[in-house]
UniProtKB/Swiss-Prot annotation:
It comes from Mycobacterium marinum (strain ATCC BAA-535 / M). Catalyzes the conversion of D-ribulose 5-phosphate to formate and 3,4-dihydroxy-2-butanone 4-phosphate. Catalyzes the conversion of GTP to 2,5-diamino-6-ribosylamino-4(3H)-pyrimidinone 5'-phosphate (DARP), formate and pyrophosphate. Zn(2+) binds at residues 264, 275, 277. It comes from the Bacteria. This is Riboflavin biosynthesis protein RibBA. The keyword Cell division does not apply. The lineage of its organism: Bacteria, Bacillati, Actinomycetota, Actinomycetes, Mycobacteriales.
């Protein structure tokens, strides 16, 4: 196993104006980024970064800073597969030459981090790429963008970093992997940490959710405890339906059956046949009830994969005209999937969950939760109920979004798919 350094050392180095290396999850980019605080940028630091990285230097910024500086999205429809929020590129208006030199880019970085700077201090386009970090940092999105802003803030500096991916010195044309990054860190006296470690540190020292209420909820699947949460970063309320003891005198929080369910008014409440959400929620509650122990976490604010109810209805109009569920979102200028699971992960941790069997057909959901210190020991598939109204939608989820759905090609209205449930499940 690769030797890692402490988050405390990385924070101290950032505060001292040094660079650090941060590695993300192997199921995500699986890359190491060189990171330093933007306000500490010097020509020497920038030249070092350019020499050992791809050279595509970015400056992650807090959302409020982006708003103050008028940094609009680079493209209206973000199609980046990891959701990196690129904004329009910039150069400092004054004190630079062409903008590309290490000295010029250091000047632009420091200006981006300066709380006194305004939008008019920059020219657009330029040679530095600002990125908009998610509010809540790595607890909301486990990316290098958020890690850079978190590290700067934890060091007592302005919420602005500088990042770029380290390239391999052994395999030209590839990005450096973990073992090579450790050697590189030792050669240059740099701290090497992971985003997972940063998440764990923040989880131990900070809390971004609040448990507000708890009540008994009798359902047709038996009785659950409904535990309500709020988040300081979202004006949204979430509910966890809990069955049995998750963690306590007789339970250690391991091997918990968990469903993280995205809100779907049309499917969950109205019984729409355009999606499989309602039947999946019902099946999850039934499976947890039958297990006698588990959690069904109902995530509000995830309507339409995060685009909202009215946008979802607009997307339905486009689907009726021939677009699939992905293209409909993109035509509306919206991402195919805007959900994040950071708050859900914190709720599960608060409930005492340590390891889980995750009820989902969506492998991306596993990645979205796994980066938060929750150990997913198994992905448990949910049964699928296909019909003439949702078969194309299900095929799109399988073919374009990577969902693990089998039997769809053999579907016709009179035949049930493998694992389809009835009222007895």
């Amino acid at each position: 196993m690769t030797r890692l350094d402490s988050v405390e050392r990385a924070v101290a180095d950032i505060g001292a104006g040094k660079a650090v290396i941060v590695i993300d999850d192997e199921d995500r980019e699986n890359e190491g980024d060189l990171i330093f605080a933007a306000e500490k940028a010097t020509p020497e630091l920038v030249a070092f970064m350019v020499r050992y990285t791809s050279g595509y230097l970015c400056v992650p910024l807090d959302g409020a800073v982006c708003d103050r500086l008028g940094l609009l999205p680079m493209y209206a429809v973000n199609q980046d597969k990891h959701g990196t929020a690129y904004t329009v590129t910039v150069d400092a208006k004054n004190g630079v030459g062409t903008g590309i030199s290490a000295s010029d880019r250091a000047t632009t970085m420091r200006l981006l981090a300066d709380p006194a700077s305004v939008a008019e201090d920059f020219t657009r386009p330029g040679h530095v790429v600002p990125l908009r970090a998610k509010d809540g940092g790595v607890l909301r999105r486990p990316g290098h963008t958020e890690a850079a802003v978190d590290l700067a803030r934890m060091a007592g500096l302005q919420p602005a970093g500088a990042i770029c991916e380290i390239v391999s010195q052994k395999d030209e044309g590839s990005m450096a992997q973990t073992d090579e990054l450790r050697v590189f860190a030792d050669e240059h006296g740099l701290a090497l940490i992971t985003i997972a470690d940063l998440i764990e540190w923040r989880r131990k020292h900070e809390k971004h959710i609040e448990r507000v209420a708890e009540a008994r909820i009798p359902t047709r699947h038996g009785e659950f405890r409904a535990i309500g949460y709020t988040s300081i970063y979202e004006d949204v309320e979430h509910v966890a339906l809990v069955r049995g003891e998750i963690a306590g005198p007789n339970s250690d929080g391991d091997d918990v059956l968990v469903r993280v369910h995205s809100e779907c008014l049309t499917g969950d409440v109205f019984g729409s046949r355009r999606c499989d959400c309602g039947p999946q929620l019902d099946a999850a509650m039934a499976m947890v009830a039958r297990e006698g122990r588990g959690v069904v976490l109902y995530m509000r604010g995830h309507e339409g994969r995060g685009i909202g109810l009215l946008h979802k209805l607009q997307a339905y109009q486009l689907q009726d005209a021939g677009d699939d569920t992905v293209d409909a979102n993109l035509k509306l200028g919206l991402p195919a999937d805007a959900r994040d699971y950071g708050i859900g992960a914190q709720i599960l941790v608060d409930l005492g969950v340590r390891s889980m069997r995750l009820l989902t057909n969506n492998p991306a959901k596993r990645v979205g939760l796994d980066g938060y210190g929750l150990h997913i020991i198994e992905r448990v598939p949910l049964p699928v109920r296909a019909n003439a109204e949702n078969i194309r939608y299900l095929m799109t989820k399988r073919d374009r979004m990577g969902h693990d759905l089998t039997g769809l090609d053999d579907f016709h209205e009179s035949v049930h798919l493998p694992g389809e449930f009835g009222g007895a499940l």
